[in-house]
């Protein structure tokens, strides 16, 4: 009886020592963010993502919409591609009425920021196992921002299989960067007059 008590206590301690990891709601197959400072002073932020949904919460709450904030007085938003690949392989293109322009909620009680816009991309054709594909750019006109100044978190709510963050500047400009709390070493190369 005493041995049985020790076995139960040992088993309970092992169960507590190894916490159960919850399954993720979704998974990014690829997430790519590219920031480019062009020679004329204009800037481009290009985001490409592939996101596979696993739960109803991911479809209906977490990832059913994508939000892109920009200032139309100085910036232009270009949606290069937006569609959903369903589990059976069929593709559902995002219709024109699924791109909804609204005032960002943070600017609601701030009249000075009422010129900002938030593009809500409502992803259509969602089902469990579907993959969302979104590729867009926010292009900033010359003179609005003098240099690239990026502070980007590498973490998302769901796991990421492939994450690419790139900064590109003309080769005559210095490229200053810092990677905090990471073990990766950035690769710097110069191609066609651009330092990346």
Regions found by a protein language model. Name each.
Residues 8-17:
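Bacterial N-terminal signal peptides
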Residues 1-9:
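Bacterial N-terminal signal peptides that target proteins for export
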Residues 22-196:
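Beta-strand-rich, non-transmembrane domain signature
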Residues 3, 18-25:
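Bacterial Sec-dependent signal peptides at the C-terminal "C-region" and cleavage site
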